[in-house]
Amino acid sequence: MKIVIIFFIAMMAVGVYSKDGYLVKKNGCAYDCTVLFGDSNCNGECKAFKASWGSCYAFACYCRGLPDSVPTYPSSKTCSS
């Protein structure tokens, strides 16, 4: 029973300290990609920001399990390329 309680507490902690979203560069633009070649590139970019994984979705890198400190789209900055 203690193991089940510890498991649920751990799962709640993961939910509190991680988020999902489109990865944003310092200029406010999303990391772009192509679906054919983008998954491995996006996975690497997302993991560089401590995400659990990433993939190319709608021509931008979508990350799962990002720390709360990492900016995601829509960011407060407008995209200035």
From Swiss-Prot:
Role description: Binds voltage-independently at site-4 of sodium channels (Nav) and shift the voltage of activation toward more negative potentials thereby affecting sodium channel activation and promoting spontaneous and repetitive firing.
A Pfam family hit: Toxin_3
Protein name per its UniProtKB record: Neurotoxin LmNaTx11.6
Keywords: Disulfide bond, Ion channel impairing toxin, Neurotoxin, Secreted, Signal, Toxin, Voltage-gated sodium channel impairing toxin
Localization in the cell: Secreted
Taxonomy of the source species: Eukaryota, Metazoa, Ecdysozoa, Arthropoda, Chelicerata
Cysteine disulfide partners in this protein: 29-79, 33-56, 42-61, 46-63
SMART domains: Knot1
Highest taxon, organism lineage: Eukaryota
GO biological process assignments: defense response
Molecular function in Gene Ontology: sodium channel inhibitor activity; toxin activity
Entry domain remark: Has the structural arrangement of an alpha-helix connected to antiparallel beta-sheets by disulfide bonds (CS-alpha/beta).
Domain LCN-type CS-alpha/beta: 19-80
